[in-house]
């Protein structure tokens, strides 16, 4: 039987009483006389929105927040020499109509702030507290809307001496893996060492072929003009219940054993695949066409998740590639099958989505974007922060107590978080659904674990 991490929301601080002390622009330490632009791939093009993460640190007497703030500012200035695009601005190239980055040296944001609370008084760091948005700055009030930085770093000190690093990046700048590399490089400079992994900023490595060649059906993508509903990336004003379900390493192990018993061995039975299969079954069976109706078992459900393609291309992308080197894998099936098929078969369907993404398939998807200007679309997207390892980065003042994204109301996205207790094999599943769907989701979650 599965157990929810939070049966009901904990008491959350609605206001962290954060005061902005200083808001400035920072620039690369090495000036360049060459004005250039950075090409953005078709994968980057559709990710023009901000991603915000918060990294909480316990007090360290050897590193008071004031000292940490100054060290971070100096390290970021130096780091932007390697990541100069972070000081640039997004623009639309009038000749092509494509987004690119104008590497104009306009600067990144650096904000210092203070909260009237201690870190402990913030309470549960895992539960998606909307107030955590106060720990991140996405727009600098001193700048016009068309001149906002792609990267803003905020350090917020707490009364106990702990602090939070809040980072807002436009998603065109990094994917999860390259952002982890960025944090590791930042930590290296803070340790007064060379960059651990010098970045590869050449986005033309994922440029579409000329002429484009779409060799596969791409059910995971939809053309802009063909989609009347919102994308999986848009927030909703609909009231949603948040619930976090915790899966221990032992429960994940049992799910893998159960899947192995009923699978045909064509795909690997991984922790991610079994958790994603569990989420897909629960989400699909919780959706009703109309209020009060049961789930239409003949309805097709599509689940999406990101797959890193760095090692799948020929030639392979450098591991240090900074852009979005992820494509959307999918699995598609009728709800009837998700209800009746053995769990191992559902896991196979999930795994086949990843297995499908070969070099040729990836190039076909990129070329599809060149021709049709669309985006990923499905019933649910699993966004996994589970094994990105942000909390494993070792800074001079230690590792984060917890690292997490700032969560907004998105009912079509289920988030996977690592265990705050350091058990990297356990996972939190965060779902945000209307109340009636949430009760069904929980029912099927517990039913699947039985």
From Swiss-Prot:
| Catalytic residues identified in the record | 171 (proton acceptor), 394 (proton acceptor)
| Location(s), subcellular | Cytoplasm; Nucleus
Key words of the record? Acyltransferase, Cytoplasm, Fertilization, Nucleus, Transferase
* Entry's Gene Ontology BP terms: double fertilization forming a zygote and endosperm; regulation of DNA-templated transcription
Looking up Gene3D superfamilies in the UniProt record yields: Chloramphenicol acetyltransferase-like domain
Q: What domain of life is recorded for the organism?
A: Eukaryota
What is one term from the GO cellular component aspect held by the record?
nucleus
EC class name:
transferase
Tissue specificity:
Restricted to the central cells of embryo sacs.
Task: Explain the purpose of this protein.
Answer: Required for double fertilization of the egg cell and the central cell by two sperm cells, resulting in the formation of the embryo and the endosperm. Involved in the regulation of embryonic expression of PHE1. Essential in maternal tissues to ensure the paternal embryonic expression of several genes, including RPS5a and FAC1, both of which being essential for early embryo and endosperm development in fertilized seeds.
Q: Which PANTHER family match?
A: ACYLTRANSFERASE GLAUCE (PTHR31642:SF189), TRICHOTHECENE 3-O-ACETYLTRANSFERASE (PTHR31642)
Protein name listed in UniProt: Acyltransferase GLAUCE
Q: What is the protein's species of origin?
A: Arabidopsis thaliana (Mouse-ear cress)
The gene designation is GLC
């Amino acid at each position: 039987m599965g157990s929810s991490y939070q049966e009901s929301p904990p008491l959350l601080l609605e206001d962290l009483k954060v005061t902005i002390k200083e808001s400035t622009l920072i620039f690369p330490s090495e000036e360049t006389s060459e004005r250039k632009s950075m090409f953005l791939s078709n994968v980057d093009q559709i990710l023009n929105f901000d991603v915000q993460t918060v990294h909480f640190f316990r007090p360290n007497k050897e590193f008071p927040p004031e000292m940490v703030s100054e060290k971070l500012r100096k390290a970021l200035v130096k780091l932007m020499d390697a990541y100069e695009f972070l000081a640039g601005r997004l623009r639309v190239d009038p000749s092509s109509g494509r987004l690119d980055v104008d590497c104009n040296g306009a600067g990144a944001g650096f904000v210092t702030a203070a909260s009237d609370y201690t870190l402990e008084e913030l309470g549960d760091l895992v539960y998606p507290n909307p107030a955590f948005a106060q720990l991140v700055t996405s727009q600098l009030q001193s700048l016009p809307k068309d001149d906002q930085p792609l990267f803003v770093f905020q350090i917020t000190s707490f009364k106990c001496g702990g602090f939070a690093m809040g980072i807002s990046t436009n998603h065109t700048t990094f994917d999860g893996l390259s952002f982890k590399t960025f944090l590791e490089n930042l930590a290296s400079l803070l340790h007064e060492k060379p960059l651990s992994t010098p970045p590869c900023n050449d986005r033309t490595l994922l440029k579409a072929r000329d002429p484009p060649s779409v060799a596969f059906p791409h059910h995971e993508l939809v053309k802009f003009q063909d989609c009347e509903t919102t994308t999986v990336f848009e927030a909703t004003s609909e009231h949603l219940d948040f619930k976090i379900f915790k899966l221990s390493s032992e429960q994940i192990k049992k799910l893998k054993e159960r899947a192995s018993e009923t699978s045909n061995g064509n795909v690997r039975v991984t922790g991610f695949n079994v958790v994603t299969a569990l989420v897909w079954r629960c989400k699909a069976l919780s959706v009703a066409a109309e209020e009060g109706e049961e789930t239409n078992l003949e309805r097709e459900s599509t689940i999406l998740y990101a797959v890193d393609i760095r090692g799948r291309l020929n030639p392979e992308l450098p591991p240090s590639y900074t852009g979005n080197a992820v494509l959307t894998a999918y699995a598609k099936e009728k709800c009837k099958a998700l209800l009746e098929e053995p769990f191992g078969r559902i896991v196979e369907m999930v795994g086949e989505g990843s297995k499908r993404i070969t070099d040729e398939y990836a190039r076909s998807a990129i070329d599809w974007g060149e021709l049709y200007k669309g985006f990923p679309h499905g019933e649910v997207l699993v966004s996994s922060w589970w094994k990105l390892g942000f909390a494993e980065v070792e800074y001079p003042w230690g590792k984060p107590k917890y690292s997490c994204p700032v969560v907004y109301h998105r009912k079509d996205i289920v988030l996977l978080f690592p265990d705050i207790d350091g058990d990297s094999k356990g996972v939190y599943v965060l779902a945000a659904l209307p109340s009636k769907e949430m009760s069904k989701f929980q029912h099927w979650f517990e039913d699947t674990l039985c």
